Amino acid sequence: MLKEYRTVKEVVGPLMLVDQVDGVSFDELVEIELHNGEKRRGKVLEINKDKAMVQLFEGSAGINLKGAKVKFLGKPLELGVSEDMLGRVFDGLGNPKDGGPKIIPDKKLDINGIPINPVARNYPDEFIQTGVSAIDGLNTLVRGQKLPVFSGSGLPHAELAAQIARQAKVLNSDSKFAVVFAAIGTTFEEAQYFIDDFTKTGAIDRAVLFINLANDPAIERIATPRMALTAAEYLAFEKGMHVLVIMTDITNYCEALREVSAARKEVPGRRGYPGYLYTDLSTLYERAGRILGKEGSITQIPILTMPEDDKTHPIPDLTGYITEGQIILSRELYKKGIMPPIDVLPSLSRLKDKGIGKGKTREDHADTMNQLFSAYAQGKQAKELSVILGESALSDTDKLYAKFADAFEEEYVSQGFTTNRTIEETLNLGWKLLTILPKSELKRIRDEYLEKYLNKAEESK
C-alpha cells in the first residue's frame, strides 16, 4: 500500500520539498492532491536522508503547504504505447490533444529508455531520401544516423522540418516508415502549422505528434523528447518500423534544463547551463540507431536555434560532439530568397559515404558530390575576389565558377518547401550544373562517369 505524506515543507518555482519520507527512489513518479481535490504529478529529483526534492509537471500555483497530500507511486514516468498512436496528436506528457479517445496501451514503458548496448548496434548504411537536394545529394542522411539542423532565430527550420517529415522514405525497402515529431516549447501558431501541414498532406497517417507549448511547464519540456523517443523505440524495435524522429527546438529543451537547475541552486556551467548538459543531451541523441537482428531503426533529426547565430554556443557545440554531423541554415542565403537556406559548405554528414553508391543511390554519387562541393567553394571564392578587385580581375575560368555558384544556389539548393526531388533528379541536376564548367575542370570525377553522364546532361540542356 502506498504511503501518503502531508509533510510538504517548501515550494519554490517548479520544486517541492517533502520531509520525513521513507523508501523513496530517484526519478520516482509522484502524485500530489491539493486541498480542493485537484491532482498534479511530479517526479523525484533528489533524495537527502529523509527529504525528497520533487519536480512538478503542472507547476506549483495554488499549492497549500498544509493541505497538500503527496503519494510516491513506486515507478518512473511511463508512456502507454500502441500502434494506435500513429495518426494521433499528444501533449508533452503523452495525453491525447486531438480530441480523440485515450490510447489503450499494449504496454507501458519507462520514458528514460534503456541504452543500446554498443556491441548490439548495427552500423548505419542505408540511404534515406528526404526529397531535399542539399541533403540527399551532398549531406546524405543514413538510416540509424543522428543528423541535427543548426538554425537561427527567424529562419524557416519549421518549414524544413515539416517538409522532411512529409517526404522522407527509405528506398528499396518494404518495411513500414513512420515519423515521430516532437515540438518542444513551441508557440501555438507553430504547433498549429505542424498539425495542419501533417493533416492536409496526409503525413499524419504515419506520424505520431507530441506538442509541448511555450506556456506549458518547463518540466514538461524535459519529458517531451523522452516521450517521443519512447514511442519511436516501441515502433522501431517491437513493430519493425523505420522511424524518423524530428525534435524541434532542442534550445528550448536546454533552456528548461537551465531553469530547473537554477531553481535547484546547482553550480552553473558555461553560460549558466548545468554542468551535465552534455551528458543529458547524450541520453536523447544516443537513443538513435539500429540493433543487430532487428528490422526497425531510429533516425534522428534534432533541430536547434543557435542563440545569436553562434556555432560556439554550448548547445550547438555539445550537440556537434554527440551527433554525426550537422545541417546549417544560412541567414545570408535566406535574405537572397534561397529556400531552404542550407549552407552546404559548413554542413556535414559524417556517414554520407556509407549510404551512397551503386545499389544504394547511384554509382556516380560520390564523385559528383565531391565535384559539386569543390566547384561551389571555388565559385564563392571567385565571387569574393570580384567584390574586392572587381570582375575584370577574374580569369575566364573564375567567371565560370562564379556563374556556377549562382546557378548552384538558385537551382540546386533552392527548391522551395513543397518540391520533392528523387535522388535521380538531384544527381541529374548536379550534372546539368557541372556543364557550366569546362570538362578539363571536372578533375574529381572518373572518366567513365564523365562519358556516361556528362554527355546526357549536355544533351538535355
Swiss-Prot record:
Domain of life: Bacteria
Single annotated GO MF: proton-transporting ATP synthase activity, rotational mechanism
Keywords: ATP synthesis, Hydrogen ion transport, Ion transport, Transport
GO biological process assignments: proton motive force-driven plasma membrane ATP synthesis
InterPro entries according to UniProt: ATP-synt_VA_C, ATPase_a/bsu_AS, ATPase_F1/V1/A1_a/bsu_N, ATPase_F1/V1/A1_a/bsu_nucl-bd, P-loop_NTPase, V-ATPase_su_B/beta
PROSITE patterns: ATPASE_ALPHA_BETA
CDD domains per the UniProt record, alphabetical: ATP-synt_V_A-type_beta_C (cd18112), ATP-synt_V_A-type_beta_N (cd18118), V_A-ATPase_B (cd01135)
Pfam families per record: ATP-synt_ab (PF00006), ATP-synt_ab_N (PF02874), ATP-synt_VA_C (PF22919)
Function per UniProt: Produces ATP from ADP in the presence of a proton gradient across the membrane. The V-type beta chain is a regulatory subunit.
Family stated for the protein in its record: Belongs to the ATPase alpha/beta chains family.
Protein name as it appears in the record: V-type ATP synthase beta chain
Organism (species): Clostridium botulinum (strain Hall / ATCC 3502 / NCTC 13319 / Type A)
